[in-house]
Amino acid sequence: MAFSKSWASALMKVAFAAFAMSAALLSGCSEQKPAFASVDVTGADYAKNFELTDHNGQVRHLTDFAGKVVVIFFGYTQCPDVCPTSMTELAEVKTLLGKDGERVQGLFVTVDPERDTPELLKAYMANFDPSFLALRASPEQLALLAKDYKVYYKKVPGSTATSYTMDHSAGSYVYDTKGQLRLFTRYGSGAKVLAADIALLFR
C-alpha cells in the first residue's frame, strides 16, 4: 500500500510540473504577441523595402531608418483633409511618446509627383515635424510601389489641367525597429491609439 501511495504521489508531482510548464509556455506566448488596436500584419510578404528620393534629393531605403519605428503614409500636398490630418496626428504621436518619440520616423510618399516638387514637399513637411521626410518617385516607379504596398490612387480631373484631385488609400504602414512591417493603422484611429501601439513595438 505504501508503494502505491508513493507512486501516486510521484505521478501527481509530475502532472503538476507538466501543468505548470504548460501554463508558463502559454503565458510566454501571450506576452510575445501584444494586442494591437491597429491591424496586425506581422509576417506580411509585401512592402518590404523601397527606393525613393526624399525632399532633400537623397535616395532613401527602408534600411536607412534601422533602429526606428517607421510610419509611412501615401498622400499629396493639395489633399484637403485626410493627408494633413494624418500627418498632424503622427506629429502628436511623437509628442505623446516622449523621449521614445525621437525614434519614430514619419515618411510621406506623394501620389502626385506631377505637382509635388521637392521644394513643395519640403515646405509641406515643415508644417508637421522637422524630422519628417517626404518621398517622391517617377510615375512609373510609383505605380510599382503602389502595387507592392497595395495602395490605391487615381487622378480625378478638375476644371483645368492642373486643378485635379487624387483619390487614394487612407492609412499608414508601421514598421518596427528591425524594419519589419507590423501594423496597418486606419485613417481616423487617432494619435493616442497609434502612440499606444508604437509603445508596444518599442518593448
Residue positions per predicted region:
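C-terminal motif of bacterial Sec signal peptides marking the signal peptidase cleavage site
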Residues: 25-28
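Short active-site neighborhood of thiol/selenol oxidoreductases, capturing the structured segment around
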Residues: 62-86, 90
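Short, internal strand/loop/helix patches
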Residues: 122-169
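Bacterial N-terminal signal peptides that target proteins for export
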Residues: 2-16
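Bacterial signal peptide processing site
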Residues: 30-32
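Conserved helix-turn-beta segment immediately C-terminal to the redox Cys motif
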Residues: 68-69, 85-109
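Thiol-/selenol-based redox modules, centered on thioredoxin-like
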Residues: 159-203
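Thiol-based oxidoreductase modules, predominantly thioredoxin-like and allied folds used
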Residues: 103-116, 131-140
